[in-house]
């Protein structure tokens, strides 16, 4: 299938993140000239395996691994400049050219050390007070978005004006240090090594934060851009663009399992707001979903299995699927595929097609269970409800489907899959009402079954 020109594709996770978006974005960039991150921060983690070499990315779009592809960090991303340059330097050591191909929106809010301090201290305060932790990564994402919504954030463009930056920084420190000391008891809190250089007596200090920001400013200036303008000009010139979502739909701040969510909108609609490209220019929405479900951190998970006991299906998923977070290293909870959850994701994203990942992880399981709905307070429903409280009361309704013992690793043609694997995929299509466009059969870029190319003309 030949890709058309001037076609834009949005890639989103349909579950709780970790669906394998990085590999598929990398694969799709063969047909794209630009890749855009439009939300989240360095709490995201995308792993690519190319020719057996594993690369983990947190901020830079996955398209950076394709020579000649331009990469953009849109205004919807909250940016830790320090983490960005760590990532750039790591890629450059591996021989990847980054700086000439990366553009960073001047409208990105900055993540600064006091944001991470607030994040860590709040989780500690919740735990100390007996409340369940949200399960944040502790990287300051939520507090940075709070400053953005309150219209007090320091943004990338502020780095060009040191005096203005310094004045706004002092105002922010006065506010956030008050919260840290008065409400969170930061004077008695032991911050980790990464934050210690900025903190004295539980207070974040002006000088180390300002000095570091000014160092980053000089390195960042060549990459600062009006990303919205550049993307619209590229589209007008016939470029194919790929919009790379982070996390997943069920972590969306509005549509996820609130309050066990991230602090941004992870759904496809935010690709427009988070990049400055109008929604009429988004032509295909590809939903990435694992062949089973995983979740990191707290919050309800209707189809969760025992994933710690050897010999159980959940343990098989956890070990064969190597289910540990790219960013945090935390073990992911594992469970059966939830088609009722996917129906919710399909609705809020307007999915055009699905990509099923990690099908190969299910190899060897003789029987699979597919959640097709729930019983909630005595009533049968076929769509995931809104909010954590009702979701926690959902009892999954399963269909049992025969598994397969044959290996699917590396299969690249649909007809070469085991017959039971094909039946499993067909049932997912039937229950969710969304056609499968792609199937991933290993972490390797080339181990992909293409059924409908997202960049092909309709």
Swiss-Prot record:
Entry's cofactor comment: Binds 1 Mg(2+) ion per subunit.
Catalysed reactions, semicolon-separated: IMP + L-aspartate + GTP = N(6)-(1,2-dicarboxyethyl)-AMP + GDP + phosphate + 2 H(+)
Location of the active site: 18 (proton acceptor), 46 (proton donor)
Keyword Cell wall biogenesis/degradation: no
EC top class named in words: ligase
Pathway: Purine metabolism; AMP biosynthesis via de novo pathway; AMP from IMP: step 1/2
Residues involved in GTP binding: 17-23, 45-47, 332, 358-360, 440-442
GO cellular component, one term: cytoplasm
GO biological process, one term: 'de novo' AMP biosynthetic process
Annotated substrate binding sites: 326-332
Coarse class of the protein's main subcellular location: cytoplasm
Record key words, sorted: Cytoplasm, GTP-binding, Ligase, Magnesium, Metal-binding, Nucleotide-binding, Purine biosynthesis
InterPro entries, A to Z: Adenylosuccin_syn_GTP-bd (IPR018220), Adenylosuccin_syn_Lys_AS (IPR033128), Adenylosuccinate_synth_dom1 (IPR042109), Adenylosuccinate_synth_dom2 (IPR042110), Adenylosuccinate_synth_dom3 (IPR042111), Adenylosuccinate_synthetase (IPR001114), P-loop_NTPase (IPR027417)
Localization annotation: Cytoplasm
Similarity comment: family membership: Belongs to the adenylosuccinate synthetase family.
Subunit structure, as described in the record: Homodimer.
Purpose: Plays an important role in the de novo pathway of purine nucleotide biosynthesis. Catalyzes the first committed step in the biosynthesis of AMP from IMP.
Protein name per its UniProtKB record: Adenylosuccinate synthetase
Annotated source species: Acidovorax ebreus (strain TPSY) (Diaphorobacter sp. (strain TPSY))
Gene: purA
């Amino acid at each position: 299938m030949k890709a058309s020109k001037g076609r834009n594709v949005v890639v989103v996770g349909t579950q709780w993140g970790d669906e394998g978006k990085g590999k598929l974005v990398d694969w799709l960039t063969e047909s794209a000239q630009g890749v855009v991150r439009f939300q989240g921060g360095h709490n995201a983690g995308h792993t690519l395996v190319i020719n057996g070499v594993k690369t983990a990315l947190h901020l830079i779009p996955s398209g950076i691994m394709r020579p000649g592809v331009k990469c953009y960090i849109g205004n919807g991303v909250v940016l830790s400049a320090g983490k960005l340059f760590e990532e750039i330097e790591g890629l450059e050591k591996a021989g990847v050219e980054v700086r000439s191909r990366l553009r960073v929106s001047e409208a990105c809010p900055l993540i600064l050390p006091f944001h991470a301090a607030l994040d860590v201290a709040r989780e500690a305060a919740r735990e100390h007070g007996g409340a369940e932790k949200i399960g944040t990564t502790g990287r300051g994402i939520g507090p940075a978005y709070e400053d953005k919504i309150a219209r007090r954030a320091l943004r990338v463009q502020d780095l060009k004006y040191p005096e203005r930056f310094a004045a706004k920084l002092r105002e922010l420190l006065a506010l956030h240090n008050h919260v840290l000391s008065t409400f969170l008891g930061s004077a008695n809190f032991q911050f980790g090594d990464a934050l210690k250089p900025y903190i004295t007596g539980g207070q974040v200090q002006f000088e180390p934060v300002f000095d570091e920001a000014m160092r980053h400013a000089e390195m960042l200036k060549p990459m600062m851009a009006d990303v919205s303008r550049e993307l619209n000009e590229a589209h007008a010139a016939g470029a194919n663009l790929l919009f790379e979502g982070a996390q997943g739909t069920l972590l969306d701040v509005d549509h996820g399992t609130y309050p066990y969510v991230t602090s941004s909108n992870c759904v496809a609609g935010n690709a427009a707001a988070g990049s400055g490209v109008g929604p009429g220019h988004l032509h295909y929405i590809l939903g990435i979903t694992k062949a089973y479900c995983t979740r990191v951190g707290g919050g309800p998970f209707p189809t969760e299995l025992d994933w710690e006991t050897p010999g159980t299906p959940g343990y098989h998923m956890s070990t064969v699927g190597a289910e540990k977070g790219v960013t945090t290293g935390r073990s992911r909870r594992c469970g059966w595929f939830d088609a009722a959850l996917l129906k919710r994701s399909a609705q809020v994203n307007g999915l055009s097609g699905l990509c099923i990942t990690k099908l190969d992880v299910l190899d060897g399981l003789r029987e699979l269970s597919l959640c097709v709905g729930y019983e909630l307070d005595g009533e049968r429903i076929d769509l995931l409800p809104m909010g954590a409280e009702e979701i926690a009361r959902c009892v999954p309704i399963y269909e049992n489907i025969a598994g397969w013992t044959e290996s699917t690793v590396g299969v690249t043609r649909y007809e070469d899959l085991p017959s039971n694997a094909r039946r499993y995929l067909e049932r997912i299509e039937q229950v969710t009402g969304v056609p499968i466009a792609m199937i991933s059969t290993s972490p390797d870029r080339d181990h992909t079954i293409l059924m409908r190319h997202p960049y092909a003309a309709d």
